[in-house]
Amino acid sequence: MQAKTAMMAAVALLAVGGLAPLAAKQTAVDYSAALASSERPGDDTVRDADRQPAAILAFAGVKPGSRIVELAPGGGYYTRILSLAVGPNGRIYTRTSRLGQAVATWAATHGNTSPGVVTAASASLAPEPVDIVWTTLNYHDFKIIKVEGGDFAIVANRLAFAALKPGGVYLVNDHDGAKGTGTSQTDTLHRIEMAGVIAEVEAAGFKLDAQSDVLRHPGDDHTTRVTETGIRGKTDQFVLRFRKPAKRR
């Protein structure tokens, strides 16, 4: 199991190497120990081949000691990986509309993980500036949640920008929609067109730094609900790395 995980991690680093020039300048981080940890449930590890977590962590620049806000952690698949990857000197702040049991259970035995609630009225995402704000397969859901003045995606982008250190990373991964569909399928197929996400996040002050094709699936025609048998785990997904502009000297 450990040998297989190490091989997946090495392949993942090669997979993103040509897509993320800034990441290539950084010292490569070995995520194999985190991914092979016996603390991860079996239901998580069987999903690794589809979700390519080592590649996504490398693309985002996750490393020991990183401070990360994870928006909408769901069942905690990435919460557990991120917590193990950043180690005892790092910090994971999970933020969602309601606290989930899976994340709460993990946090109870892992002091580097701090669950919390975020709403449209929240003033901040974390008690300190963070290196990365992370959301996977949730941005389309943010568009469904309506708040005063628009939808929760606008709130999430604003809070993410405020939470990040200058030069920090906003990692957005979601199921892509067909060209021209925009946000029309967020509540039906649970897809969102990448072009609109880029425009919206950049309007919040971010700059698109790079995108990874590691979760691209050309065989997905973008017409099927993402939870349908046969497509689940094999959807065509975009992975975008935005940066908060660094302060000018």
Tell me what each language-model feature is:
Residues 124-137:
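A short acidic, Gly/Pro-enriched loop at the edge of an enzyme's catalytic core
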Residues 64-74:
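Conserved class I S-adenosyl-L-methionine
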Residues 31-59, 63:
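Class I SAM-dependent methyltransferase Rossmann-like catalytic core
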Residues 221-249:
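Core SAM-dependent methyltransferase catalytic element
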Residues 182-209:
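Conserved Class I S-adenosyl-L-methionine
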Residues 64-65, 88-89, 164-170:
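Short glycine-dipeptide loop
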Residues 101-127:
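S-adenosyl-L-methionine
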Residues 83-84, 148-166:
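A short glycine-rich, Lys/Arg-flanked "PGG" loop and its adjoining helix->strand segment in the class I
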